[in-house]
């Protein structure tokens, strides 16, 4: 296509779109730019794959350091594996796109977003989301779009669209809203304990801006003469569908109302119906029967139609009767149990959070400032993280066997969400300088493990003695929409997540929301339904919080005896080199003497860590004496370092030497210095004079016995 260049004036900042400039062999390609941030988004599709029953969509977001005028480090001087932030942005693009493709589409779709240029104000993520919609439309892939996304910030009492990095950092809200013409399709947010109503207003505010961007895409389509591609769904074998329904529907209904069945028992019962009532019946049909011919040609046909029938019956039961497969009401939370301190104190904090069959074991570890995760290797201005949450989902948690791999996108995404939920309640760094890591091990899963990780993290932090501002709990909300009938489900379990239309995770304190994430399987939700889901989550969160506080209602007053003890002090930044010493000699000596770990910040903040408080105090005293200002008349216990004919040099503090003239060694006349002192001797001295060059003149004369006894040894 010919080059197309269009600028959209959007909330005080232009968004520039260029099509036909780059990647002519991609199905669709758009360069979307705001400020100095520019992202190339491409969409490509291929022919359908045989034998799959899912949408083969792949989304990748990539960052290049040339975008910020930098060269990668390392021997190869190339970008390595994508950082965690890039994986999270890939998910951010994927989640609003996926529900807008036909669920029966089986052609491979690949979306690649590459940041080509980046400034320090405009984040590339929401640009990439909006750009993906334009690229998909241009690629003529069937799509229920257009779709767009914006970020909403809160500065004071005012919402703003697409805030800068600094505005997000200084505000109380970081919310991304994506939507289609049918409504909201994705929400993700971190908030500083904002009330539900504020969050609802922010989403509504953001969706209005999304509608403007959708309108701009329609204008572009009109100018270019493009239309959104449509495709007809594959035909359904109605005879086979009726055959399955006639033989299985009643049996499925009976299983769905056996509320005492566990997850494994229910799954087994449903599988047994498919195997006996359907597959055995098909096997008994004549070889030339159309149904048998169909199933032999398409072995997955029975499974797909049976799954569709189960989904339909479960959803009808919820909509018509208001009863779920485990017998709960729509707004009822599964049974909860909480335990803390399950492991020996070598693990600094531990908690087991159980909700139904979902079980999360969270373990907290306290570290020193040097353990903070350095984030300075990518394009973003953030320096380091002092709170880390890692989420693990082993195969045994769902009774499966799989090879163990490094964390995938799902694990990284769930871990980041739970981390975001806790961040607003962490104590300030100057009050609690520890770096904290929580690992949530999902040991059993039946839905809502990410919110279980939030609850487990809170309990583990309190068990570890971390003085969090307030405890945080979380709940996952679901949705069933049949025509105009909408039912919102509280605390969804696995089957409801799998067969439902929404997974809306809400976390927060009794004051307000700290994090939320909404994913859809339908093409959009009205604001009324979004608001109702957020409001319905509140009593669930508070109920869960009550259960947690019944086990531990405040952080433990003491840390684990195996947690490091931290002391902080300030020194003049000009003295940092003195404390470190040539080649790190001085600081290494202090750490070896005291068994401590020392971190020094550029502003002169010194953090000392040791398992025993006395060792940390010893290191602090050494650094204090090393950096303190000496005054005339003060008495010290020093060590003789060398002798010259006219006197002896004494180190009174680490790195600080003075000289005792031979006449100041004793009351009597001294013929040779060696008569009074030798190298290595400890001597009590007084600062007699500090000359204009800062040199110390010391004396052993005129020191009262009480002063000598009170001197604290510095080496």
UniProtKB/Swiss-Prot annotation:
Limits of the KH domain: 564-623
Keywords: Cytoplasm, Magnesium, Metal-binding, Nucleotidyltransferase, RNA-binding, Transferase
The protein's name: Polyribonucleotide nucleotidyltransferase
Entries under Pfam families matching the protein: KH_1 (PF00013), PNPase (PF03726), RNase_PH (PF01138), RNase_PH_C (PF03725), S1 (PF00575)
NCBIfam families, per database record: polynuc_phos, PRK11824.1
Example of a GO biological process term: mRNA catabolic process
Key word Magnesium present: yes
List of residues binding Mg(2+): 497, 503
Any GO CC annotation of this UniProt entry: cytosol
Alphabetized SUPFAM superfamilies for the sequence: Eukaryotic type KH-domain (KH-domain type I), Nucleic acid-binding proteins, Polynucleotide phosphorylase/guanosine pentaphosphate synthase (PNPase/GPSI), domain 3, Ribonuclease PH domain 2-like, Ribosomal protein S5 domain 2-like
Compartment(s) where it occurs, according to its Swiss-Prot or TrEMBL record: Cytoplasm
Source organism phylogeny: Bacteria, Bacillati, Cyanobacteriota, Cyanophyceae, Oscillatoriophycideae
Domain S1 motif: 633-701
């Amino acid at each position: 296509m010919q080059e197309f260049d269009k600028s959209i004036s959007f909330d005080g900042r232009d968004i520039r779109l260029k099509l036909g400039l780059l990647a002519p062999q991609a199905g669709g390609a758009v360069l979307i730019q705001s400020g100095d941030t520019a992202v190339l988004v491409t969409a490509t599709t291929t022919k359908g794959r045989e034998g799959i029953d899912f949408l083969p969509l792949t989304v990748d977001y990539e960052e290049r350091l040339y975008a910020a005028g930098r060269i990668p480090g390392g021997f190869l001087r190339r970008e390595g594996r994508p950082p965690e932030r890039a994986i999270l942005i890939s998910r951010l693009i994927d989640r609003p796109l996926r529900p807008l493709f036909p669920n029966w589409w089986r052609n491979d779709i690949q979306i690649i977003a590459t940041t080509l240029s980046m400034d320090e104000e405009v984040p590339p993520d929401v640009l990439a989301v909006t750009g993906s919609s334009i690229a998909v439309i241009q690629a003529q892939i069937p799509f229920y779009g257009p779709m767009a996304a914006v970020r909403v910030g809160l500065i004071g009492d005012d919402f703003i669209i697409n805030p800068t990095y600094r505005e997000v950092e200084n505000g109380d809200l970081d919310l991304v809203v994506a939507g289609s013409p049918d409504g909201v399709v994705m929400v993700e947010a971190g908030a500083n304990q904002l009330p539900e109503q504020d969050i609802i207003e922010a989403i509504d505010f953001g969706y209005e801006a999304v509608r403007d961007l959708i309108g701009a895409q329609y204008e572009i389509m009109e100018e270019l003469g493009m239309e959104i591609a449509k495709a007809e769904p594959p035909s359904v074998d109605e005879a086979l569908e009726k055959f399955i329904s006639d033989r299985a529907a009643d049996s499925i209904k009976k299983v769905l109302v056996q509320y005492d069945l566990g997850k494994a028992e229910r799954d087994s019962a449903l599988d047994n119906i498919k195997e006996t009532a359907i597959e055995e019946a098909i096997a008994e049909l004549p070889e030339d029967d159309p149904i048998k011919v169909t199933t032999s040609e398409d072995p997955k046909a029975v499974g797909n139609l049976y799954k569709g029938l189960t989904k339909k019956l479960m959803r009808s039961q919820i909509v018509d009767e208001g009863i779920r497969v485990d017998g709960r009401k729509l707004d009822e939370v599964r049974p909860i149990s909480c335990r803390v301190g399950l492991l020996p104190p070598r693990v600094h904090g531990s908690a087991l959070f159980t909700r139904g069959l979902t079980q999360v074991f969270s373990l907290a570890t306290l570290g020193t400032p040097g353990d903070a995760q350095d984030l300075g290797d990518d394009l973003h201005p953030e320096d380091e993280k002092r709170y880390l949450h890692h989420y693990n989902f082993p195969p045994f948690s769902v009774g499966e066997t799989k090879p163990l791999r490094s964390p995938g996108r799902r694990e990284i995404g769930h871990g980041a969400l739970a981390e975001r939920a806790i961040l607003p309640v962490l104590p300030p760094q100057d009050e609690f300088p520890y770096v904290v890591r929580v690992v949530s091990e999902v040991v059993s899963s039946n839905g809502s493990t990410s919110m279980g990780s939030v609850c487990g993290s809170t309990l583990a932090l309190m068990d570890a003695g971390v003085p969090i501002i307030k405890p945080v709990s979380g709940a996952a909300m679901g949705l069933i929409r049949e025509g105009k009938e909408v039912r919102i489900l509280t605390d969804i379990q696995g089957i409801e997540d799998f067969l439902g239309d929404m997974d809306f995770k809400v976390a927060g304190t009794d004051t307000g929301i700290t994090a939320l994430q909404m994913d859809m399987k339908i093409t959009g939700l009205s604001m009324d339904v979004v608001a109702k889901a957020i409001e319905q989550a509140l009593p669930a969160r508070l109920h869960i919080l009550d259960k947690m506080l019944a086990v531990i209602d405040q952080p433990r007053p003491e840390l684990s005896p195996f947690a490091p003890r931290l002391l902080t002090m300030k020194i003049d930044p000009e003295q940092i080199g003195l404390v470190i010493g040539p080649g790190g000699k001085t600081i290494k000596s202090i750490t070896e003497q005291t068994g401590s770990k020392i971190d020094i910040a550029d502003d002169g903040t010194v953090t000392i860590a040791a398992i025993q408080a006395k060792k940390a105090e010893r290191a602090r005293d050494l650094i204090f004496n090393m950096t303190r200002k000496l005054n005339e008349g003060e008495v010290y216990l020093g060590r003789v370092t060398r002798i010259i004919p006219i006197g002896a040099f004494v180190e009174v503090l680490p790195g600080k030497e003075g000289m005792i003239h031979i006449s100041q060694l004793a009351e009597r006349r001294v013929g040779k210095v060696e008569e009074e002192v030798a190298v290595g001797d400890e001597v009590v001295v007084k600062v007699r004079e500090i000359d204009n060059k800062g040199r110390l003149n010391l004396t052993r004369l005129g020191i009262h016995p009480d002063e000598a006894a009170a001197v604290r040894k510095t080496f």
